[in-house]
Design a protein with these regions (language model features):
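A transmembrane-helix-recognition feature enriched in membrane-embedded lipid enzymes
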Residues: 2-46
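C-terminal accessory "lid"/substrate-recognition subdomains
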Residues: 2-10, 165-285, 337-341
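Residue-level signal for inorganic ion chemistry
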Residues: 26, 61, 112, 143, ...
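Walker A (P-loop) phosphate-binding motif
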Residues: 32-98
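Short, flexible loop segments at boundaries between secondary-structure elements
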Residues: 262-265, 304-335
Length: 341
């Protein structure tokens, strides 16, 4: 994941990239071959995949939620497919937000489950059948799995972070790419550039040259009220914590202290005690992300949670019609798939 990834992945290529290039070539060949030859089970419902070209966080979860909301506005019954993070179930498991913890199902599925049923399993096809048969879903949104899922995808929306782009442009282990861009673009239906920055410009141009539509969106706090004028100790265990810190600043909050943690981090009692003590001593308000709050829900004291502010965010598309277009094109592709049998 991004925060555990070597920093050189996000810098100009150097001797380490050169040294790892033979391994990257082997990985790239295997990954490309795997994507081309994968047997993908066809599901009796439209499947929209929210993926990314690289390892790590690009803001897929808020995008998946925004598109689920759009599907509901179009009178569809969406359901989410997720493999979870660290969760392990022999059979597909539908998330129960009242009883499941992030340790069991992952933090992202807990966030998704506030909006639609979520099936957690590495076997996306089995999860899909569960959502269709038992939960009445008629539109499936897959959170990640773009490269690996053994399920037919009707529309693949690939999310690229404008600030980080595709890093040094090399394939694992020399860089963050999960496969060569040319191999991944074959399976890409549309590209979504998230946020401000120029790091993604080259891959956006490459996608545009390949005839893929380019969309743009950004993250906004759900409510900016309450942040202005406050001094915060902000902490986060996500792919790129700096993005969260910037969002707090942009919403008018003053960041006196920041504490980044690894992606999907489970906080120990002494870490939470240190955060609380520092905030108290400095007269600061603790603030974190919705993902971190999902992990803390069953792992922190109620007293800590009561004093914690959580920054809820929304994905805002630069053009209002884009979410409806993506859902429509997913439905169109599914109808074409059914006609072909």
């Amino acid at each position: 994941v991004a925060s555990e990834a070597p920093p050189f992945w996000w810098e100009e290529p150097d001797w380490r990239v050169l040294a790892l290039s033979p391994l990257s070539a082997i990985y790239a060949a295997a990954a490309g071959r795997g994507m081309r030859r994968a047997k993908r089970e066809k599901i009796e419902a439209p499947v929209l995949c929210i993926g990314n070209f690289t390892v790590g966080g690009t803001g897929k979860t808020p995008v998946a939620i925004a598109l689920a909301k759009q599907a509901k506005r179009m009178r569809l019954k969406p359901g989410f497919l997720s493999r979870g993070h660290g969760g392990s179930f022999a059979e597909p498991h539908v998330v129960d937000i009242h009883h499941d913890s992030a340790r069991h199902v992952g933090d992202e599925p807990l966030l998704l489950a506030e909006h639609a049923p979520v099936a957690v399993t590495p076997n996306r096809a089995a999860g899909a059948r569960l959502l269709l048969e038992r939960h009445g879903c008629d539109f499936l949104i897959m959170d990640d799995g773009f490269q690996s899922a053994r399920i037919h995808i009707d529309y693949a929306l690939v999310v690229v972070d404008a600030r980080y782009g595709i890093g040094n442009g090399r394939v694992i282990p020399g860089g963050p790419l999960r496969a060569k861009i040319v191999d991944q673009l074959v399976f890409t239906s549309g590209l979504l550039k998230m946020g401000e920055g120029t790091a993604a410009d080259a891959v956006v141009r490459q996608a545009a040259r390949a005839g893929r539509p380019i969309f743009e969106a950004h993250i906004e706090p759900s409510s900016k009220a309450g942040l202005a004028g406050k001094r915060f100790l902000a902490f986060a265990g996500i792919g790129h914590p700096e993005k969260f810190f910037d969002t707090v600043r942009e919403a008018g909050g003053e960041l006196a202290l920041t504490r980044p943690f690894p992606d999907h981090h489970f906080y120990a009692e002494d870490e939470l005690a240190e955060l609380a003590a520092t905030a108290h001593a400095e007269g600061l308000v603790l603030i974190t992300t919705a993902k971190d709050a999902a992990r803390l829900r069953h792992g922190a004291s109620q007293d800590f949670l009561d004093r914690l502010e959580v920054l809820e965010i929304d994905t805002v598309f630069e053009l209002d019609h884009v979410p409806e277009r993506i859902i429509d094109e997913t439905l169109d592709a599914w109808r074409q798939r059914k006609l072909k049998g």
